[in-house]
Structure formats: structure tokens, C-alpha cells
From Swiss-Prot:
Binding site for ATP: 39-47
Primary location group: cytoplasm
PANTHER family tied to this protein: DEOXYNUCLEOSIDE KINASE, NADH DEHYDROGENASE [UBIQUINONE] 1 ALPHA SUBCOMPLEX SUBUNIT 10, MITOCHONDRIAL
Gene name in the database record: dgk
ATP-binding among keywords: yes
Active site: 114 (proton acceptor)
GO molecular function: ATP binding; deoxyguanosine kinase activity
Binding site for substrate: 63, 75, 86, 115, 120, 180
Location of this chain's protein in the cell: Cytoplasm
Superkingdom of the source species: Eukaryota
Full protein name: Deoxyguanosine kinase
Family statement: Belongs to the DCK/DGK family.
Length: 285
């Protein structure tokens, strides 16, 4: 069931709720862990994240596809909407990560993210490789992504559901979402290739990566064992040194997150059609 080609430490602490409150346990290195659940379209992420959340007592944060104003447009005219949609999704996923991080700090509780700001790159890179995002547009995207990632910790755990693209296509056809029916196999295969590169990146960053063969789904209890039988470091390989600073207070970090969320509300670049190098029609932000 499991392929462990990219494997390292995950928490073996079965007690998911810390006893101490923020006021008494206020050092950054007392975080509960952050898990990101990744995989191709229709790999089974949402179902598994919900089940793991229930069993671990973790809060689940879903990706913002339900409110994506560009998704159906992208599937119909990918070259027109690729960059603007990826910048919108990058912004939304960053905001979701900030919310999850703040929740974990305030509640001393682990969190699971169904996709993340980290894996947003997979979709952008796939669009770039297919010629849907120009080199200049991709450079712009990466500059935004780098800025976002510099403000957040690296996830403790990266769970990847490894599903053959043909199987993903079959599941897409079976769930019959209108906006997805035009997705070609080549697009899913491209995402699969980009995800493999992404996992190497996450390993190099210091996240704890487990690859799960999910072609026939799997036993959730075995997934739990994989998580609980390993150890994890708090943010020892973080993008930002403050997550490793034992003297940095949780309340200060929460304040930093709030400030960043407020800053994000003021950012309009992700909807700025003037910077879209694919000559998209102007959409009001």
C-alpha cells in the first residue's frame, strides 16, 4: 500500500490536544503539527482529510475551489485564464494557510490542509510547461509565491496520494462535475509529473513526506499508523527563523499573522490584468 521513497519524520504523539493554553505555553516550538494533504485532481484528498481530521482531532482546512470564479472559465479557455486563476488561487491558499497556522497557535491543535500554498506551484508549473503561462508571467508568479512562503513555516508532514492519471480521469468522469468534464488526460499526466518534482522540493525544505499508493484507496487506520509511528521536528527547517526561536512568543506570532492577513486584503496584484502576460481580457477586481 505504501511507497516510502521520500520518507522522514512525523509525530508519534497520539495526544493531539496540548494541555497548556497559549498563556502558559507561549513559545513557538510548542506548535501542534501542520499536515498538508496533496494529490492530483480526484485523488481522494477531501474524503481522506475529513476522516483524518475526525480521527486525529485535527481541524481541516479545505481548498477554495467552491468559490473559484475562474475554474470553469479556465477549463474552457485555459490560455486566457491560466495566470489570473493561479494568482487568485495562490492568494486564497496563502490566506487559508495563515488561518490554519493561527488556529493551530490559538488552540494548540493540529491542522490538515487539503492542498496548500506550497503545492499551488504544481498547477502553475504545469500551465507554464504547456505554454499557458508565459516565462514573464511565471516569473511574476514565483516572485509572489516566494514572498508568501518566506512568511510561513514549512509543514511538518506532507501526505501525497499517488494515483495514476488514468485512474484520476476515470474518477473525474464518475463524479460528473460539469466544469471538469473537459479535462484531458495530458493535463492530469502533467500534474502528476509536477507533483513528483514538488515532493522533492518539500523533502529538501525539511517537510516529512509520505507517499501513499491510493489507486484503490486504502486503509485509513494504516495511514494513521504511518503518522503516529514517526517523529517530527517542530519548525527546525522553517522558511523564517522566528518559527525556530524559542524566545519568540506565540502571541507575537499571532499578531504577525493578523497583520499579514490585513496586508493581504490590500493586495490587488493577483487580480491585476495589466500584469497578465497572456493578454487576458480585463476583469474587475
Amino acid at each position: 500500500m505504501f511507497r516510502r521513497s521520500l520518507m522522514f519524520m512525523i509525530s508519534n504523539n497520539k495526544n493531539t490536544n496540548m494541555v497548556s493554553s497559549i498563556n502558559t505555553t507561549n513559545k513557538v516550538n510548542n506548535f501542534s503539527k501542520i499536515i498538508i494533504l496533496e494529490g492530483n485532481i480526484s485523488a481522494g484528498k477531501t474524503y481522506l482529510s475529513s476522516k483524518l481530521g475526525d480521527l486525529l482531532g485535527y481541524k481541516v482546512f479545505l481548498e477554495p475551489t467552491a468559490t473559484n470564479p475562474y475554474l470553469s472559465l479556465f477549463y474552457k479557455e485555459p490560455s486566457k485564464y491560466a495566470l489570473i486563476m493561479q494568482k487568485w488561487l495562490l492568494n486564497q491558499r496563502y490566506n487559508t494557510f495563515l488561518n490554519a497556522l493561527q488556529y493551530s497557535l490559538e488552540n494548540e491543535q493540529g491542522v490538515i490542509l487539503d492542498r496548500s500554498v506550497y503545492s499551488d506551484w504544481v498547477f502553475a508549473e504545469n500551465c507554464r510547461s504547456e505554454g499557458l503561462i508565459s516565462a514573464e508571467g511565471f516569473k511574476e508568479y514565483n516572485s509572489i509565491r516566494d514572498r508568501f512562503l518566506s512568511n510561513i513555516p514549512i509543514p511538518n508532514v506532507t501526505l501525497f496520494l499517488d494515483v495514476d492519471p488514468k485512474q484520476c480521469l476515470q474518477r473525474i468522469q464518475n463524479r460528473k462535475r460539469d466544469c471538469e468534464q473537459s479535462i484531458p488526460l495530458s493535463y492530469l499526466s502533467g500534474l502528476d509529473n509536477c507533483y513528483k518534482k514538488f515532493l522533492i522540493e518539500m523533502k529538501s525544505k525539511g517537510s516529512n513526506v509520505i507517499i501513499l499508493d491510493w489507486n484503490n484507496f486504502g486503509d485509513i487506520n494504516l495511514v494513521l499508523n504511518e503518522i503516529n509511528n514517526d517523529n517530527f521536528n517542530n519548525f527546525n527547517n522553517s522558511n523564517n527563523s522566528k518559527f525556530n526561536d524559542v524566545n519568540y512568543k506565540k502571541q507575537q506570532l499571532i499578531s504577525d499573522i493578523e497583520n499579514e492577513k490585513n496586508n493581504l486584503k490590500e493586495m490587488k496584484f493577483f487580480l491585476n490584468e495589466n500584469n497578465n502576460n497572456n493578454n487576458q481580457e480585463k476583469i474587475k477586481s
